[in-house]
């Protein structure tokens, strides 16, 4: 999942939406990798285990400071798998806007400098990664990052891409 990541500054708690910018150091790209079968087999209520393996949340290629992004809710996000465009959306299509995310997270916990929030995606154009793939994410104004996928078990899955409820 190609997502915008928020790099936080703190410590802060209870940040209202109108003050969301004071909680943000900057923005970067994150590939939110999921081992969906692992998540489903280990915990019925969700997939947190399937998102918790080493290397499953690569960040980069840089951190743009918050003043360099005029509107984090209007950025083009693209994801390629081995050169094929799989996923493209605008951050205005995320389920929750950045001010709402900051308000919600800080209502639950104190955020500290360096904490990162993955903002989510629109869930269309998702598909499996396999050994030998090159996963690339690009976010408008932030940059482009490439990751070489390595699976020592050399597993493979059908190359189906989820394109919404009718796919």
Language model regions located:
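Short, basic and Ser/Thr-rich N-terminal targeting/leader segments
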Residues: 1-2, 23, 57, 73
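Short, structured patches in soluble enzyme cores that scaffold and shape functional sites
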Residues: 2-10, 28-33, 63, 81
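Short beta-strand segments in beta-sandwich/barrel cores
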Residues: 11-13, 143
């Amino acid at each position: 999942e190609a997502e915008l990541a928020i790099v936080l500054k703190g410590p802060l708690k209870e940040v209202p939406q109108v003050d969301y910018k004071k909680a943000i150091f900057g923005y970067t790209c994150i590939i939110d990798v999921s081992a969906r079968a692992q998540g489903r087999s280990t915990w019925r209520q969700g997939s947190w285990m399937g998102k918790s393996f080493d290397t499953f949340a690569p960040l980069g290629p840089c951190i743009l400071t918050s003043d360099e992004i005029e509107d984090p809710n209007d950025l083009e996000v693209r994801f390629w798998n081995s050169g094929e465009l799989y996923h493209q959306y605008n951050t205005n299509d995320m389920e929750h806007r950045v001010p709402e995310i900051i308000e919600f997270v800080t209502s639950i916990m104190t955020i500290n400098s360096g904490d990162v929030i993955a903002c989510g995606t629109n869930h269309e154009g998702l598909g499996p990664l396999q050994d030998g793939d090159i996963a690339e994410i690009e976010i408008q104004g932030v940059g482009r990052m490439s990751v070489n996928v390595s699976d020592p078990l050399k597993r493979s899955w059908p190359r189906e891409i989820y394109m919404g409820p009718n796919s």
